[in-house]
Amino acid sequence: MRGFIGGLVMGLVIGVVLAVTAPGSKISSSPGNAGQPVAKLANSNNIEKPVKWKLASAFPSEMPLSGSLGLTMIDRLKEISSGKIEVEFHEPGALVPTLDLFEAVASGTVDAGLASSQFWGEKSAAFELFGAVPFGPDIASHLAWFRHHGGQKLYEELYHRNNIHSLICGVTGAAGAGWFDHPIKELKDLKDLKIAATGLAARVYRYIGATTVNLAPADILAALKKKQVDGVAFSTPAADEFLKLNEYAKHYYFPGWFQQAGFIDLMINLTKWEGLSKSQQKTIETACMANMDYSLAAGEAGQFDALKNIVIRGVDVKKFPPKITLALKRAWLKVARTRASANKDFRRVLNSLKNFREDYSIWQELGKI
């Protein structure tokens, strides 16, 4: 570590000297946001027309954060735009089946959707890396990578290929590892189970021998009640409590190996996005930024109360034995290598995030207690 830092400092000094003394060297006068991804904007001289959109949500409106953020965003938009941007919230399945939401937004069948990109792994493997990353970064570093180190550019490229413009419109923190109807003491206890899971969590659970089922959030409790699944890997304690998973599974495990941070996406039909004025686009971006700020604080603030309620209801809350967590990490590394070898987009996103985390870890080791 010290040797590395010494070399890093020396390299920076030499680089600065060479840059200053090189012939024709110039100091860039580019604005601070140069190089940042900029969405294709409509002609700002266009006459603004009132916007009235329908939004289909993958999450129930009463679900803490994941769902309620949709209503919060809609209220913000109406207030900021003085009523000129109106979005009508529709509960999961009301307009289209939740797992068909991607196609519905891409085609313009619905104007916008609220979901997690981990649902869209069959569209592109790389989408799953924006939803939840196994053994991944916390919220702060995940946002740092996304906003300032290439993540947003890759994210927008993926969505734009599919005629969707997407904005991060909320964040979630660490998830639980899973709910099960019996204790999990050994890795073999996970094998042959049927687990409701999506994204990369599902791929890792399948790698170790479990079977997974991709369910819309609103369908998870019914599947658990009918014993169609033996376990559930979903989200944060607050969201899990809302689904009432404790009624049919009494063993809740941590840590959240498959999600330390998650993004909630506002997907907008790209043609309709480009038809907005620059001012209207900025209004939507501003509302989503405010949503992110709110969800970051409120999400962390609400988790202990949710855990307390879960324990009161008789759930056994504990951590996986370290050997299980280690086995899951090894499985993830193998899954990641396989996915990266098979898919260029997955490889680009994974390498971008990996390179950032390697550099960021030096700052973490030096600066954080």
Where are these regions (language model features)?
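A gly/proline- and charged-residue-enriched helix-loop-helix capping module
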Residues: A140-E156
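N-terminal secretory/targeting leader peptides
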Residues: R2-H142, Y159-I369
